UniProtKB/Swiss-Prot annotation:
Species of provenance: Pseudoalteromonas atlantica (strain T6c / ATCC BAA-1087)
Keywords, in A-Z order: ATP-binding, Cell cycle, Cell division, Cell shape, Cell wall biogenesis/degradation, Cytoplasm, Ligase, Nucleotide-binding, Peptidoglycan synthesis
Residues involved in ATP binding: G124, T125, H126, G127, K128, T129, T130
Cited InterPro entries: Mur-like_cat_sf, Mur_ligase_C, Mur_ligase_C_dom_sf, Mur_ligase_cen, Mur_ligase_N, MurCDEF_pg_biosynth, UDP-N-AcMur_Ala_ligase_MurC
Keyword Acetylation: no
Disulfide bonds: none
Source species taxonomy: Bacteria, Pseudomonadati, Pseudomonadota, Gammaproteobacteria, Alteromonadales
Protein name: UDP-N-acetylmuramate--L-alanine ligase
Amino acid sequence: MIAPDKVHYHVPEMRRIKNIHFVGIGGAGMGGIAEVLLNEGYQVSGSDRQANGMTDRLSGLGATIFFGHQASNVEKANVVVVSSAIDPTNPEVNAANEMRIPVIRRAEMLAELMRFRHGIAIAGTHGKTTTTSLIATIFAQAELDPTFVIGGLLNSAGTNARLGSSQYLIAEADESDASFVHLQPMVSVVTNIEPDHMETYQGDFQKMQDTYIDFLHNLPFYGLAVLCIDDPVITQLLPRIKRKYLTYGYSEVADVRATHVKHTFNQSEFTLKRKDHQDIQVVVNAPGKHNVLNALAAIAVATDENIEDAAITAALANFSGIGRRFEMLGEFATGEGDVLLVDDYGHHPTEVEATIAVARNNWPDRRLVMAYQPHRYSRTRDLYEDFVRVLSQVDVLLLLDVYSAGEEKIEGADSKSLCRSMRQRGQLEPIYVADKNELPKLLADNLKDQDILLTQGAGNIGQIAKELQEMKLDKGALRTGWSK
């Protein structure tokens, strides 16, 4: 459990700033920063299109929440914080500009929170949320009481953000809009680098890599980079990094290394090897090869901070997971047999493939049924062939329409096209779900006894999973349709 220090670490207040307004406050990243600022004593308001768990939580903590975007929402603000999803023509942004109220991106506010703290920033295409959560859990186990801002719900804390009493701030660094270059942490972690959010980088993967170098060079000369040497792109970039770094991975040349890895049901166990340390056995209460790498990153950071091995191993063994990261929502008697419902946020082919691998390892003899919702037309276009290959690995695929996240439709980068390409590949016959309201009936027609139903994606598929959980996957209820 998190135990506060006797003396709270004092962070200077932002001069002239009392009222902070967030446009798009319902997102995990935005809402997390808003929660920390509320707990620091600032007046916080925010707007979003509709209520969700985040807006409900912030409202309960004292934030003023508006639904819908209008100019009057920012009248009392001293600064307006916007997410990357907010259109520059948003009426609240326009009003703030007219009133000469500073409009800043989320990462700029996070950078301000980090400026007077010992910042630990976690970047990478995959694994940011889990790695950030593991680091926060280890620091809490060591009674260092960190502040953290995470892109998912940390189950042990019941929140994705918390104001701690120590100097430590542990946060995800968002590469999706390149805003992570605003951060100036003491420790930077990079888990991997793959093409994603390529519209931010004008479709130039080299430009993305250069931006990661800029992010790492924001470290002070006495800072530390923690890098996954198993990632081929990171390995190629090592000669360009002009800061001290530690490497981690399965590779024999890694500074922090896992050997003798065993994967059991929902856990991983390995021998930890570090230079100038005795080998120890580690159990991570999270499944899959990818989570061993995430744990190694967390161990590297903790070791650099001189956290004792006992705290590290206890935290990893008792890690209670994150919302929507291979989250088991229950096994239900559907009327014709038992079906296990698992929900996962992964929306990049590498992430989806890792999720499938964990499901196959956990339940090798059970059929895998996936309801997948692609996220963004641009990602579907850029990674099209990888999606076709990976999604063909399940036994039954129900493919929902692309969750646009505000993007215009791109010809040939939609779910119908994916279905056509998978049929041509010949491994399975995907089921196209033209209307999400048809999903329950299609599930009722296709689920069998002992199936694993995996709801996958970063759009509103998570809410769909919760509704399926409420229906307990009962075939009669599924045929009736959504309860709301």
